[in-house]
């Protein structure tokens, strides 16, 4: 008997009813999109969201956006794109083990860093200093996905995906810090922490800025002595603690206190030795200088931006239009513009 197209999506939704725990998010129970659409014949709503993000221009640009080390340092360092893929992989592993919606996790993970600026967090710091209302990449990710992509139409993603992206950032468990309303969104937040702390250590060791022996022994004894062991420890702990939470009626993703403290301390070590350390300061300052100059140039010459961003200037103001243009740039494109604007091309007599 042939299976009609409509039943293909229904088959997936039927499987979700069996495989996803009651506390998880089933596709058929979505809170919907800002603009209502007809359902896809084959894919669930979260599969559609995942595919829209993957096929977006903003997603493709992540391959040329720095994670920590600018690509001129070598070919094997993580980019914002490879970081995103690692977050998705870790998140799906955690989600599958708990019994959550893997498609929702994947969509949130793939979109979580869409709003990041060129040159990693140095770029974010520049825009945060220059813009009257500050700048946060998670909020910008939502703006890119809802107001910038598809020439201003946005991708019209589900509320679950947008909420997970908005709340993925931060390293705090304070009660006043809001969290994603789905467990899937909370999984991505933890997966992001697990991924970036560990792969930044791996890249720093590859760059010769750290050695395994430099890592605090008390933390390594808790988390593991190498990259794969640490990820294994953190993933298993997140799964077990979350299942324990659910069993006790606390519907939230988490880690055991011992493991989470160790992860936070390892992140603190990375801030002191790498992210804010003296070794990379010169490179950070160069990146910031480039962004400052390009931003200020377009503040004075907004008429030289593409028409799309000039329209934003007219509708939402000069700073917003320039910020949208700058925040979408890859490292390569930002450097190209800097050279075109400020570096002479011919000898002047």
From Swiss-Prot:
Disulfide pairings: none
Record domain HD: where: 80-197
InterPro entries: dGTPase, Diverse_Catalytic_Enzymes, dNTPase_2, HD/PDEase_dom, HD_domain, PHydrolase_assoc_dom
Signal peptide range in chain numbering: none
Keyword flag RNA-binding: no
PROSITE patterns the record matches: HD (PS51831)
Molecular function as annotated in GO: triphosphoric monoester hydrolase activity
Domain of life: Bacteria
Keywords (A to Z) from UniProt: Hydrolase
Family: Belongs to the dGTPase family. Type 2 subfamily.
Protein name: Deoxyguanosinetriphosphate triphosphohydrolase-like protein
Organism of origin: Clostridium tetani (strain Massachusetts / E88)
